[in-house]
Amino acid sequence: MKFYPGQNISEIVYHFQSNETANRLDAYFACGCEEDTEVLARLKQCNPRLLHLSYAAFCLEMGSHSIEEMEYDDGELIFSYFQNFLLSIVSNSSKTTKLRAYIRSAFAYHFQHFVEFDQYTNDSLNTVDTSVSAQGIADLALSMVRWIPTQIKKVVNFGVGSVIESFSEHFNKLLMQYCPIVFQAFSWVNNIWTMVKEWIEEAAKEISWFLQGCKELHAWGMCILASSCALGLVEKCLISLGMISESFDLVGLFVRSAIVGAFCVSIKTGKFVTNSELITCATIAVSTIATVMSQAFKPSEEIKGQFQALSVLEGLATQLTSFCDTSLVAMGKTCTAFNQICTAGKNVKVIAGRLLEVVSNFVRKLLGLDSAFLRDAALIFSQDVDGWLRNISWCQEQFLLKAYMSQDDLIVLRSLVVKGERMREQMLEGEVKVSPSVCNLIVKGCEEANKLMRESRLHCSKTIRKIPFVIFAHGESRVGKSLLVDRLITDFCDHLEIGEDAVYSRNPSDPFWSGYRRQPIVTIDDFAAVVSEPSAEAQLIPLVSSAPYPINMAGLEEKGMHFDSQIMMCSSNFLEPSPEAKIRDDMAFRNRRHVLITVELKPGVEYDESDFTKNQRYLLKTWFHYHYVVDQTFESYADLLAHCFTKWERHVKEQESNLSQIKGKKSESGHFYNFQQLMDLAVSWNLNADIMKNRIKAERNDMVYVFSAGRKDKILHCFLNKEGECTVRPDSIDDPEAQALLKASETMLMKAYAFLKYNNATNLIVRTHLAELVNEDFYDEKFNFIGTIGTPAFHRQIAAHLEKMPLWQKAILCGMGHCLSRKSKETWYTGMKEKFVQMMKSIYETEVTDWPVPLKIISGTILATILGTTFWKLFSFLRDAGNGGVFVGNVASAFTTSSVLEAQSRKPNRYEVSQYRYRNVPIKRRAWVEGQMSFDQSVVAIMSKCKASMRMGNTDAQILMVPGRRFIAHGHFFKNLTQKVRVQIVTSEKSYWHVYDPDKFQMFDNSEIGLYTNPTLEDIPHSAWDLFCWDSEKTLPNNFSAELLSCKLDTVTGQYYPRMAPINCRVHRQPIHITEGNYVRKQDVSIEYDACTIPNDCGSLVVAKVGNHKQIVGFHVAGSKGRLGYASLIPYVEPVVQAQSAEVYFDFFPVEVDSQEGVAHIGELKSGVYVPLPTKTNLVETPKEWQLDLPCDKIPSVLTTTDERLVGTEHEDMTHSWWYSKYATPMMPLDEEILSKVAQDMVEEWFDCVDEEDTFEEVSLSAALNGVEGLDYMERIPLATSEGFPHVLSRKNGEKGKRRFVTGDGEEMSLIPGTSVEEAYNKLTVELEKCVPTLVGIECPKDEKLPRRKIFDKPKTRCFTILPMEFNLVVRQKFLNFVRFIMKKRDKLSCQVGINPYSMEWTGLANRLLSKGNDILCCDYASFSGLITKQVMSKMAEMINSLCGGDEKLMRERTHLLLACCSRMAICKKDIWRVECGIPSGFPLTVICNSIFNEMLIRYSYEKLLRQAKAPSMFLQSFRNFISLCVYGDDNLISVHEYVKPYFSGSKLKSFLASHNITITDGIDKTSATLQFRKLSECDFLKRNFKQMSNVLWVAPEDKASLWSQLHYVSCNNLEMQEAYLVNLVNVLRELYLHSPEEARRLRRKALSCIEWLQKADVPTIAQIEEFHSMQRIMNAPDSNDNIDLLLSIDLLGLQGAARPSQIRLWFDDKLVLANTQEFFDGNFPADSWLPIFVNCLYPVSQLPAEAVIVNVVCGSGRGGLPTTAWISSAVNNRSSDINKKIRTALGKGKKIVFLTRVDPFPVALLAVLFGVKNEILSSNATNPMLTRLLENCKSLKYLVDECPFAFVN
């Protein structure tokens, strides 16, 4: 089959009616295709008749749209082209609706017959036959179609009025004839054409002066738009009210038929012959109108992706450019038709200009019609000549108002000059052909802009200015810094639309700023490469400032020039200022570089001549605390440029804000302060050297030529003398010499005008109205003022002042008026405009009259689209107006008045939340919303935190921000972006540039949305995580109410307006297919709702109430039928590191408060949740005589804010801020390269220490809980300590810590199944591999002795962190072998955890330090535990994994456990805090990790300091050879070899660490401002000194101040006061012995004499102490406990005796038995007949019977395992004690008593005997012999006679 333009329709009819075609169609119907949809397959089988009709319509349309001759094989036409056509138009969702409309439209268009389909043909049997109801409206359309050609034939040349009247008359007549119900139902129809007239009249007011001669074109286009819109509205209203059941594409029928008729007539009547190409071109234009109107008002059955961004001009741009085969297609393609042309223009006018250029070229080639109007219109629209001329006039006004131009104004003027020169260049080269008038217009504009530029760039402000924006490129030589700066300059010039002459290249060696003309960009290449005076660094300081800065200029006319450039770009090999730069403060130089870029080459990437940036890497650095930190690293130039643009825009906003807040702004001043200076300038400019010599000798009344002024047809030369007298000499306007003087006077006039503006001698009235006085027509030939200022009444008030103006002032103002072409009341712009209109209006009108109608319609369509502003506003309102009765009502209200109704607004700032974009912007209801809707705090949070937009050109896409530098977006837009593109991210608070990388956008399975992740995105608060419903499919019911939230850009105002609407949603579980052009994607489950969504709605959020809070449940992605919307459910996204498990007990704040870098207050515990904390100290002050007259500066710490010691002091109202202050400011990031090197060096040392027997696998839970017997450093977990949160909440009275969650005998313990700890442990082991676990710690004040200054001067109590029990268990499992290795190898490694200070280890430590010399740094850190960052912790995890190995799972688990410490939640009383740094003190690895961190810091500092000092490389690689380091937590000693002392000293170390936010001081004198080397004997370590006893022995005496405090305060937690004091006294004597044996001897004697109860045998002699130390030195046992209090822990001491399970049952009496606990659990002692008494069994109360008695005794020192005296007195001797009462009660009920124990039965047996005697089960006659014999063998129990006499006698 052959198709060609102008083909007779009979040929096509013959083709589809032939038998051969019928046979091929039958064969085609019989052959099924795999890609056939279900509906299409059914049609082929059941309804081939419909497909026959569709093939006929397909061929008819193929023929009518043929552009050139095309021939197809019949089989290929059917099986390929027709098949693809059916696949595109028949879908399972839309079924045959679109196909039927296509057939009806084609047959009505070609045959003027309406095709009716019977009920069988419809898809649903319930569909009502529409033939009757639609007949009237169908006849209306066909009649309208037939009328238009006839009417056009009558009035081919009719004007605007006849067009409107004819259309309205026939339109109303047909409605009345065929569908009178329309007038009854819709009275607004009568107002349609009245409003069309209003639209055209309004457009005429707004119409550009250039278009005054083409109103007829505008009328054509407006009538087509209005008619199409009206038909679409009528049709939709009829559907809404049920008068017809479906659309008949009336708009398409109307516009296509009307145009065809018009073409047929114009072929015969027009001046130019209309050919088929012009018909096709015009058909495309009006078809675009039909498409837009149909999509707006005709519901589509197909589910369409609603980010189409299509309008009339977009459709025209797509189809006309393709059809005309012009170069527009090559302008770039991005996403949609809109973006094909978007790169060529920035607004609608530009697109229209390009289209008119296409049409102009098209008709010139086809018709030979060389249209001046089309050529001129194409240029004027595409280049926005009108706006260009307006801006030039605006610049003139700015100069006259201020007598100078600011740098911002100057940038605008420069862009205008560049644009004008570009247009002039195009005209000169012949690229653009326009009429002479337009050419002259552009030339005049260029001349005026250049003239203003020449003069204004010498006039600048002398007030406070914007600080210039500085980009500083640093790097080694030959890395391309200069090329990079040049590239940045080019891109900034393009961004600002200025030319290359806007860049000034500064040579710092030049004392003058030669050639500086206030260029906005200044560049300095090879900054500071050459020594200059002053230095380049010194010159930069005043330049980058807001203070006025006059610069040194060579020429006299340039004197007074001030620097005000806004951008500076430098390249340099030097990062820091030179020492010879003579800068007193280096920070002043550093702070002046806003973007500091270190340029380096990518290793392994070759140089590319086509793009030198491909092998460059850019490190953005900032100076922070004495150190340069790499903030960001960019691998591509595009990312760097986006960052620079973002920083530039923020800098400009900041400067504008700062300038706007300055009060008392300094008044402007000109360059001249008196008249004499003005005269001197005139003399210097206008006279040669000889005359100037004579003038010096001239008298004051000698006249001097000053300037020439133009006035109408004359040139007046003005002469002044020193007295201010003026004479005028006229000259002819044609005299060449006079013209030269006039042109040369322009600069002088500008200077003189500035003098008048700012000279105080100028009359105040004149200065006020100076800009209005600049007018050539206001002065006669003698410069008398003849004008009028303001109203006549106002002018009369100031006339006297104006008449008194000196003659020379009037001459200046008249000359300025001539110079700037200002006459009468008009500006330069109005004058140019009126001249052009007078000349070209009639020319255009005459030309347009002769055009063929199709060309009028094409051009009119384009013009009406641009100018119909009010129409498009109404159109947008009606498009969004909903369905049904709501739609009809909105249409009626719209046509009742010419103004668009606004929906009621909502303001979200009724809630107290953080700043966001919507605070001062009303949130509006959607147009189709009927009722009100709620707006609570959750919605405000969603809009302010999560809602954002991505702008690309003029395209704006809504996106959903997700915590973790991510956003969710719709696929049908973002999947079409295949190349990197620079976009703008607009959030609620700000906007920033970003380079979108399509490789980082990943679609979710079976969903239309995807996730984009990029580290260069700015993150949102992580508290927003709870605003998402991550499990919508399970959480949401099938039907629910929700709100649709959107925020789209208003293209008119340029602002974002949030909108909302309530919707009723349904979970749609049937698959849908979302289409957008060729894009198709299947979505299995969707949210469906009734909503009149429109294009650009994609990205709107569906927010519903989930539980008690509103959450985001869906993301709008498509619409269907004009009334249905579809949203994707929010898929699950892996969360970022956030603590979640304990949040059930928390109430979070909407906004974080007291937020600092490392810590923030985020919430509080819920009401009723209480975490017990100590409020009373366990430290008891001893009696005065016990203190032995020794000094003590330490007292118990403050544990509560209500401490009575603070009452009445300034600290009475102190808060708990002391605990988090150490986390407020973590250390600065470290250089990753050097940190990795340091870590690798440490790991290599670890490997050097590994023995064959060392293993690092994880241990079992049993080993983690119980330790390993006989293996050093593998002790069991302390069970007396707290169990952590949230387990502590379930603790009952009498239960203690971790012990209530374990069971077993004394040696083998295990977790009790079913407890909260056991469940949390199991969950943690499962989840640990996947993510960093939740970690919630309790901050508990530490009960310890502190110096008085930390109590009264500045209260500061240390806290320790209690972590959950299950977390500590898992940590022990994964790291116990590593900890054992580090402690065991302390003799070789720097870490000294486990050192025994009494042993020879101390001597070995001293020798290690002295091996490098006796110059030692003794250091102390401030807030050490809060310094560590995730960077360091992550590196530490790598180090441990490198040593310990294991599979990927185990290494990942270790990493997650360590990282959990650096991102956790902390509970301090009722407050919940987020902590993002540091190591919690309750972490099992705290001391080990702190030790490793301490060593890393010292090694890192060593590496950096030696590198900076350029020390020999051998020193860098030999840390162990030159440094001897020992660390224990935050304690360290650093012995420095004399070779490296010049590079690594205390002062250098202190300064370097301070630059990283780390404060380090002298460990001995913490108040010292310096850190100096000390001798070993002057240092301390672990609060112990180094004392040399002999050549081979060093001892470690503890600081005496710490010793004396032990005698003033004792801990009575586990001991009685006397026993606790005795323990402390023995320890003090042992320590004091190391200081001096004689001093220890004197103290022992004094204690025995002063303390009465003290026995000599209780206190060891000096000989015994000496033997103690001798024994310690020969032992190699570790000291795994940090202080004496831990040594007294019952978990470590246990009950005296061997900890072996007892298997003996001991009967004291038939009513009293001692047995092992296991016998009870075996059922041998049933609770109904026995009273079980558990003694120190550690069983949880919940695991024991209610009747059981639990006895937890506190063992006394030296009491043979029995409890303390106080406990015996209160529990045993006291007959009314709780235990005694329960025993007697049980005996009264006939029960027997059984004492149960898990370990040594001896102490429990004694207790059983004592209780038995006390409660008369046993008699003293029986117990006396037994106890007497026992005392003979166990002397330590002799106290029983005195304490328990009842056991011996009655």
Curated annotation (Swiss-Prot):
<feature type="transmembrane region" description="Helical">
    <location>
        <begin position="881"/>
        <end position="901"/>
    </location>
</feature>
<keyword id="KW-0808">Transferase</keyword>
<feature type="domain" description="SF3 helicase">
    <location>
        <begin position="449"/>
        <end position="614"/>
    </location>
</feature>
<dbReference type="GO" id="GO:0044220">
    <property type="term" value="C:host cell perinuclear region of cytoplasm"/>
</dbReference>
<feature type="site" description="Cleavage; by viral protease">
    <location>
        <begin position="308"/>
        <end position="309"/>
    </location>
</feature>
<keyword id="KW-0548">Nucleotidyltransferase</keyword>
<keyword id="KW-1035">Host cytoplasm</keyword>
<dbReference type="GO" id="GO:0006508">
    <property type="term" value="P:proteolysis"/>
</dbReference>
<dbReference type="GO" id="GO:0033644">
    <property type="term" value="C:host cell membrane"/>
</dbReference>
<feature type="active site" description="For picornain 3C-like protease activity">
    <location>
        <position position="1098"/>
    </location>
</feature>
<dbReference type="GO" id="GO:0005524">
    <property type="term" value="F:ATP binding"/>
</dbReference>
<dbReference type="InterPro" id="IPR009003">
    <property type="entry name" value="Peptidase_S1_PA"/>
</dbReference>
<dbReference type="GO" id="GO:0003723">
    <property type="term" value="F:RNA binding"/>
</dbReference>
<dbReference type="GO" id="GO:0006351">
    <property type="term" value="P:DNA-templated transcription"/>
</dbReference>
<keyword id="KW-1133">Transmembrane helix</keyword>
<feature type="modified residue" description="O-(5'-phospho-RNA)-serine">
    <location>
        <position position="905"/>
    </location>
</feature>
<dbReference type="GO" id="GO:0003724">
    <property type="term" value="F:RNA helicase activity"/>
</dbReference>
<keyword id="KW-0347">Helicase</keyword>
<keyword id="KW-1043">Host membrane</keyword>
<dbReference type="GO" id="GO:0003968">
    <property type="term" value="F:RNA-directed RNA polymerase activity"/>
</dbReference>
<keyword id="KW-0645">Protease</keyword>
<dbReference type="InterPro" id="IPR001205">
    <property type="entry name" value="RNA-dir_pol_C"/>
</dbReference>
<keyword id="KW-0191">Covalent protein-RNA linkage</keyword>
<keyword id="KW-0597">Phosphoprotein</keyword>
<feature type="domain" description="RdRp catalytic">
    <location>
        <begin position="1414"/>
        <end position="1544"/>
    </location>
</feature>
<dbReference type="Pfam" id="PF00680">
    <property type="entry name" value="RdRP_1"/>
</dbReference>
<feature type="active site" description="For picornain 3C-like protease activity">
    <location>
        <position position="1008"/>
    </location>
</feature>
<keyword id="KW-0378">Hydrolase</keyword>
<protein>
    <recommendedName>
        <fullName>RNA1 polyprotein</fullName>
        <ecNumber>3.6.4.-</ecNumber>
        <ecNumber>3.4.22.-</ecNumber>
        <ecNumber>2.7.7.48</ecNumber>
    </recommendedName>
</protein>
<feature type="binding site">
    <location>
        <begin position="475"/>
        <end position="482"/>
    </location>
    <ligand>
        <name>ATP</name>
    </ligand>
</feature>
<dbReference type="GO" id="GO:0044165">
    <property type="term" value="C:host cell endoplasmic reticulum"/>
</dbReference>
<dbReference type="InterPro" id="IPR007094">
    <property type="entry name" value="RNA-dir_pol_PSvirus"/>
</dbReference>
<keyword id="KW-0547">Nucleotide-binding</keyword>
<dbReference type="GO" id="GO:0039694">
    <property type="term" value="P:viral RNA genome replication"/>
</dbReference>
<dbReference type="InterPro" id="IPR000605">
    <property type="entry name" value="Helicase_SF3_ssDNA/RNA_vir"/>
</dbReference>
<keyword id="KW-0812">Transmembrane</keyword>
<keyword id="KW-0472">Membrane</keyword>
<dbReference type="InterPro" id="IPR044067">
    <property type="entry name" value="PCV_3C_PRO"/>
</dbReference>
<feature type="active site" description="For picornain 3C-like protease activity">
    <location>
        <position position="972"/>
    </location>
</feature>
<dbReference type="InterPro" id="IPR043504">
    <property type="entry name" value="Peptidase_S1_PA_chymotrypsin"/>
</dbReference>
<feature type="domain" description="Peptidase C3">
    <location>
        <begin position="930"/>
        <end position="1136"/>
    </location>
</feature>
<keyword id="KW-0693">Viral RNA replication</keyword>
